[in-house]
Structure formats: structure tokens, C-alpha cells
Regions:
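Metal/cofactor-centered catalytic core regions of large enzymes
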Residues: 1-154
Length: 154
């Protein structure tokens, strides 16, 4: 499995805004897209190509509507989905906010029966109100070293 993911857990009540994910599968249920509206770390509203299945997933337990992981995909040679999450979560210029259980190595207190890595490719990303990534490229001086031209060696 290739390297190329930088992850942590968001502060449990800090996620606000909306995100639209690319195609995904969860326990055999296909989704062409998933769009979530989030306030204070909790999914408030959603839309997807399979709303019935998404509602069932989100209603698994209280933690299923919260996020257990946030990650940037950094592998410069993976540039499109392969429909295998162990590769897709590493697509350069992607990020994922994972619904459900956190990771033990980066706990935020969220527990759930689910851990669903949903990948979003090419989104603008803001942290603490500052835009740090535009599309697939980091734009702040302290993060530009994570762009492909800095990672690939001839």
C-alpha cells in the first residue's frame, strides 16, 4: 500500500460548513456523491445519490454524525480514484473527513460503530478561517512544500 496520507482528528465540535464527496462505497452500498452540511461538528443535513442508505448510516449511533478523522492525500503519483480506499485516500489534492470512530493514535473522543473515509478531490480548505489549500494545491508558505513539485525528485 503506498504512502501519502497525513491525518489527525478534528476537535470534535469544530467542523462547520459543507463538503461534497466524490463517489464512494460503504458496506456494499454505492454512492455517486455525498453532500453534508455540518454545524458544530455534527451533520445537520445531507444529500446523496442514495439518501435512504445514507440516512441509515448516519443513524447508526450518535457518533456516526460526527467526524473521527481529517486527512490530506499527498501522494503525487496517485491523481485519480482507483475505487480502493487505501489508494483513494492518498490521491494528491484530496482530503477526507471521516464519519464515525476516531483513530486511537489521534483521539478526539468520538466513538461510533462506523468509520467511513469519504474522499473529496480538489476542494478549497480553510483551517481556523485561513484558506490553506486552493483546489489541489497548498497556498500558504509553510505548506507549499507538500505540493507535487516539492515532493517529486527527478
Amino acid at each position: 500500500v503506498p504512502d501519502g496520507e497525513l491525518f489527525s482528528s478534528p476537535i470534535i465540535d469544530s467542523v462547520n460548513g459543507h463538503i461534497k464527496y466524490t463517489a464512494s462505497v460503504y458496506q456494499g452500498k454505492p454512492f455517486e456523491f455525498v453532500r453534508l452540511e455540518v454545524k458544530d461538528g455534527v451533520v445537520q443535513d445531507f444529500d446523496s445519490s442514495n439518501n435512504e442508505a445514507l440516512a441509515e448510516i448516519l443513524d447508526t449511533d450518535e457518533g456516526a454524525r460526527r467526524f473521527g478523522e481529517f486527512s490530506f492525500g499527498l501522494n503525487p503519483v496517485i491523481d485519480q480514484p482507483m475505487h480502493d480506499i487505501l489508494f483513494d485516500e492518498k490521491i494528491y489534492g484530496s482530503n477526507h473527513l471521516t464519519l464515525g470512530h476516531d483513530y486511537e493514535v489521534a483521539p478526539n473522543g468520538n466513538t461510533s460503530g462506523i468509520h467511513w473515509d469519504l474522499v473529496c478531490i480538489g476542494a478549497d480548505v480553510y483551517l481556523d478561517g485561513e484558506k490553506i489549500r486552493e483546489g489541489r494545491h497548498f497556498i500558504t508558505d509553510d505548506l507549499k512544500g507538500l505540493n507535487p513539485d516539492s515532493l517529486l525528485v527527478d
